[in-house]
A protein has these predicted regions:
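Proline-centered turn/helix-capping motifs that create local helix->coil transitions or kinks
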Residues: 2-10, 115-122
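Flexible interdomain linker/hinge and immediately adjacent N-terminus
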Residues: 3-41, 134-136
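Conserved tyrosine-mediated DNA breakage-rejoining catalytic core shared by Y-recombinases
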Residues: 14-15, 70-113
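Active-site/catalytic core of tyrosine-dependent DNA strand-transfer enzymes
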Residues: 34, 104-163
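Short, contiguous acidic/charged loop-to-helix segments that flank catalytic cores in large enzymes
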Residues: 42-44, 86-102, 136-145, 163-170
């Protein structure tokens, strides 16, 4: 076995570079803050749409916005949404289990309000992506849509006395925190 890097120049080890630990604090809203955001009166339609997508993520067990964007009509039944996370679709794992999310009244209303009229099983539920886009175009569209939600959500939150740090990830963490508190 030939050594590729001379130990003298190896960057890791005692008194050398250490990979930093995670400092990512999971941020979430408590029930009072969720109520304020849910009942907030948007000043612009963009704020309403941003809030609605945020709460759709929340009521769908904290579904990632990337997964919402990729939902197809085949993923939705009368009772639930069944999907495989975009994050895990391309992994080599053999036992990837689909996620099942019960459809709440809010989720049904939201899908009726924002869903594509074209409800073929192969069509996207929401008019954000379309089949004719390249992977690069889809990636840009997803990033722009998430930025759009975050930008308008921050405005709505600020106008209602909530933190401007809010983002789409807060829906995931707020759902998880709420679920843990309810089961405690």
């Amino acid at each position: 076995d030939a050594k590729v890097i001379d130990p003298e120049f190896y960057p890791f080890g005692v008194k050398k570079y250490e990979i930093p630990g995670s400092t990512n604090v999971k941020k979430s809203f408590d029930s009072d803050q969720l109520s304020i955001l849910f009942n907030a009166k948007p000043k612009k339609p963009e704020q309403e749409k941003a809030r609605d997508f945020w709460f759709f993520s929340f009521v769908c067990n904290g579904m990632n916005v990337k997964d919402i964007i990729h939902l197809k009509w085949k993923d939705i039944t009368d009772e639930q949404i069944v999907f495989i996370r975009e994050k895990t679709k391309s992994t080599k794992k053999a036992n990837i289990k689909p996620i099942q999310v019960p459809l709440s009244d809010f989720a049904v209303m939201f899908i009726k309000k924002y869903g594509n009229k074209d409800q073929r099983k192969s069509s996207f539920v929401f008019p954000i992506l379309d089949e004719s886009m390249t992977e690069e175009e889809r990636h840009k569209r997803k990033q722009n849509f998430i930025r759009y939600i975050n930008q308008h959500l921050k405005q709505l939150a600020k106008a209602n006395g909530l933190t401007e740090d809010i983002s789409t990830y807060w829906a995931r963490h707020s759902f998880a925190t709420t679920a843990v508190r309810k089961s405690a």
